[in-house]
Amino acid sequence: MDNQKLADAINTLAAFCACRDLPALSKEALKRKYGFEQADVMVLFGGSIICGGDVLANAMQNGIAKKYIVVGGEGHTTQTLRNQMHACFPEVETENRMEAEIFSSYLSFRYGLTPDYLECASTNCGNNITNLLCLLRREQVPFQSIILCQDATMQRRMDATLRLYQTDAAIINFASYQVQVVVKNG
């Protein structure tokens, strides 16, 4: 396979995984596609990609949802997140902190924002969803629409897991980033 075909194949896979149901995370885009300007809930799932925090901050600043939640305990990406966050933002405390706590501190430090809820017990994709649903029930947060924001490689998996447990809500995907590879120098 030549390099361009390989790049095209990688880009096809990346576009599939990094599902975004909206062209932009905006009230206008929500209104056009779903008929409402504000989702009931937006959830950022932890991971090692800091830009997810920026996506959530932008959504919070623009009133995209009624409630904002960060989900993430300690799992296989936690130490990488700690290392990257500490390297980029040493002011954000990371030692012995859960992913949700790290992202919450980042939101506070960089944007002066605080999510409504943190879920810090999750350790993997499956219990990210089940623990989120328990939190929503426990806190009596009703929702008919939910925006999921996750590392691009895990976005579709998070969507599929939620659909196993919650079939009556509008599930809106917005991967935290999208990438494309290019061939340079042949």
Predicted regions and their residues:
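A structural signal for short, hydrophobic/glycine-enriched beta-strand patches
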Residues: M1-G186
